[in-house]
């Protein structure tokens, strides 16, 4: 039986992420201005001077992560037997998704806060959003392995976590902290 309540809830949070990215990075309200802002995702100062080829590579991975998340959430909404997995409790599934999506939604605002006036403290605040999302994603991966999920769910969560944990939680955080220390 498909869990429409959980699906609707996670869909709304997913839309909130998209909205926060468009609102802050697209600056559609002209509220999120700072020196050096451009209206190109590829040339955005939020990439901290990464080469275009690396940005393109990360965008491909981001798209695969979005597809992976959809694959995983479909499994979570249709699965009824998680065995002894941490995901067997609905409140755990909900908490992990809320932490992951909630802090992913807050991240663009914290990143803007950093860009307005870079400092080590602000970079750590910004990175903490990514770190909390990363921890939630790691636990989602663990629960998916524990539940002996079907291959599509496992591949989906691994695609997602490669971006959330490695590209964002480690890579982008390293660039942000480096920027705060040496710029």
Q: Which residue stretches match the model-derived regions?
A:
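Alpha-helical transmembrane segments of multi-pass membrane proteins
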Residues: 13-33
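Juxtamembrane "helix-exit" motif on the non-cytosolic side of transmembrane helices
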Residues: 24-31, 107-120, 142-146, 169-178
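Perimembrane loop-to-helix junctions flanking transmembrane segments
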Residues: 32-54
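Interfacial helix-start motif at the membrane-water boundary
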Residues: 48-70
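Non-cytosolic membrane-interface motifs at loop->transmembrane helix junctions
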Residues: 51-52, 116-130, 151-155, 181-183
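Membrane-helix interface/capping segments
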Residues: 67, 71-89
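Membrane-proximal helix-loop-helix units in multi-pass membrane proteins
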Residues: 81-137
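Terminal transmembrane helical module of multi-pass membrane proteins
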Residues: 136-183
